[in-house]
């Protein structure tokens, strides 16, 4: 690994730890040339799952798009970045467990909605309004009544 400070490739790993439920390895390194410390993160290369968009075009699955969408939905809410990261991880795990080649964007959206419903109801409504392209207030009222019905069914 090249040192980000002196660009030497002479470094030593001082500590390794797993992070993000074991899907990431965090390594603390010491450059043997300039003696400065830096940290690297190793994670599994995304499997070759392709996303099938509504116009039938395909693109590689990108967890960062999901994360950005959830961050927008959770903006100014009492949801920590750690909770967002864990939610994205659960979504990614669900996708990789069920799909090995292609996944429609509609399916990704539904998985995200299911996870957001348990994370934060306002974030769920915000995401749903964009994902389902709400036209007017009745769309919002419908989703709120669905949330209330589900909460009563689950005894919340």
Swiss-Prot record:
GO terms for molecular function: ATP binding; double-stranded DNA binding; zinc ion binding. Residues 49-139 form the ATP-cone domain. One of its GO terms (biological process) is negative regulation of DNA-templated transcription. Keywords: ATP-binding, DNA-binding, Metal-binding, Nucleotide-binding, Repressor, Transcription, Transcription regulation, Zinc, Zinc-finger. Disulfide bonds: none annotated. Its cofactor is Zn(2+). InterPro entries: ATP-cone_dom, NrdR-like_N, RNR_NrdR-like. It comes from the Bacteria. Binds 1 zinc ion. It holds the Pfam family ATP-cone. HAMAP family: NrdR. NCBIfam families: transcriptional regulator NrdR. Negatively regulates transcription of bacterial ribonucleotide reductase nrd genes and operons by binding to NrdR-boxes. Belongs to the NrdR family. This is Transcriptional repressor NrdR. The lineage of its organism: Bacteria, Pseudomonadati, Planctomycetota, Planctomycetia, Pirellulales.
């Amino acid at each position: 690994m090249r040192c980000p400070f002196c660009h030497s490739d002479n470094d030593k790993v001082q500590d390794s730890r797993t992070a993000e439920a074991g899907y990431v390895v965090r390594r603390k390194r010491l450059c043997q040339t300039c003696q400065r410390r830096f940290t690297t993160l190793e994670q599994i290369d995304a499997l070759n799952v392709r996303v099938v968009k509504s116009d039938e075009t395909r693109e590689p699955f990108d967890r960062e798009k999901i994360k950005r969408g959830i961050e927008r939905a959770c903006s100014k809410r009492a949801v920590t970045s750690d909770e967002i990261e864990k939610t994205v991880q659960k979504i990614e795990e669900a996708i990789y467990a069920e799909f090995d080649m292609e996944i429609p964007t509609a399916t990704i959206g539904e998985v995200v909605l299911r996870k957001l419903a348990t994370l934060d109801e306002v974030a769920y409504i915000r995401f749903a309004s964009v994902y389902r392209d709400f036209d007017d207030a009745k769309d919002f009222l419908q989703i709120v009544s669905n949330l209330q019905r589900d909460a009563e069914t689950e005894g919340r």
